[in-house]
């Protein structure tokens, strides 16, 4: 299901029957309708970014709900797909903060230790937040708790009210939180633009001796 270290740690936090319930849920929703991302990409964030290499967490809400967009990494779409509005604003802020990045696929961030996690890992076609509140919150809360228990600093990037509520789970003082309004067109002008999350994260990582992320890669 996930990278083995993630699996071993997460299962210590979750109820014993949780994975069985998740598999039953996935069997049902993928059999009865169109669901994104493709089933083999549901846990992609944890497969691409191992626990021991995670330096930054960027928490999204749920996957894109249009065809060919969602790929299992929050905010990321394939380069062949136009950037959705939130990703457009993320790239605009990145350009103002550090420099221009032309790729829409954020896999290279994930490969550098940026965990691109959605709070809800699946979505029905055309129904934003259609699976919210059903099965996923205990899982993604468990991921945050596992990171919180680490003895090496992690930078938690929380965009928007939903993500910012997860700050309550980050109780270990060695970690760092960068928060702002969501990059959605509805809220980006209320403080996301100008928040410089990328250079701020790199400054923290550099200070902690963890090495910077190449956000333009």
UniProtKB/Swiss-Prot annotation:
SUPFAM superfamilies: Uracil-DNA glycosylase-like. Pfam families: UDG. GO terms for cellular component: cytoplasm. The active site is at residue 62. It is found in: Cytoplasm. Keywords: Cytoplasm, DNA damage, DNA repair, Hydrolase. GO terms for molecular function: uracil DNA N-glycosylase activity. InterPro entries: UDG_fam1, Ura-DNA_Glyclase_AS, Uracil-DNA_glycosylase-like, Uracil-DNA_glycosylase-like_sf. Its EC number is 3.2.2.27. It catalyses: Hydrolyzes single-stranded DNA or mismatched double-stranded DNA and polynucleotides, releasing free uracil. One of its GO terms (biological process) is base-excision repair, AP site formation via deaminated base removal. It is an enzyme of class 3 (hydrolase). Belongs to the uracil-DNA glycosylase (UDG) superfamily. UNG family. PANTHER family: URACIL-DNA GLYCOSYLASE. Excises uracil residues from the DNA which can arise as a result of misincorporation of dUMP residues by DNA polymerase or due to deamination of cytosine. NCBIfam families: PRK05254.1-1, PRK05254.1-2, PRK05254.1-4, PRK05254.1-5, ung. This is Uracil-DNA glycosylase. The gene is ung.
């Amino acid at each position: 299901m996930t990278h083995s270290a993630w699996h071993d740690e997460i299962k210590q936090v979750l109820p014993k029957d949780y994975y069985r319930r998740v598999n039953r849920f996935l069997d049902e929703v993928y059999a009865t309708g169109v669901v994104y991302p493709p089933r083999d990409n549901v846990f992609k964030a944890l497969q691409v970014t191992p626990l021991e290499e995670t330096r930054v967490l960027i928490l999204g809400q749920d996957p894109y709900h249009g065809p060919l967009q969602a790929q299992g990494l929050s905010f990321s779409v394939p380069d062949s797909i136009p950037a959705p509005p939130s990703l457009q604003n993320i790239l605009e802020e990145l350009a103002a903060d550090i420099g221009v990045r032309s790729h829409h696929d954020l896999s290279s961030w994930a490969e550098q230790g940026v965990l691109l996690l959605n709070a809800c890992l699946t979505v029905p076609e055309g129904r934003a937040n259609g699976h919210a509140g059903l099965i996923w919150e205990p899982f993604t809360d468990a991921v945050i708790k596992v990171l919180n228990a680490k003895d090496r600093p992690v930078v938690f990037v929380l965009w928007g009210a939903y993500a910012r509520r997860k700050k309550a789970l980050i109780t270990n003082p060695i970690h760092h939180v960068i928060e702002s309004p969501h990059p959605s067109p509805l809220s980006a002008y209320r403080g996301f633009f100008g928040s410089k999350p990328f250079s701020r994260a790199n400054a923290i990582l550099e200070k902690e001796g963890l090495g910077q992320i190449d956000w333009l890669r």
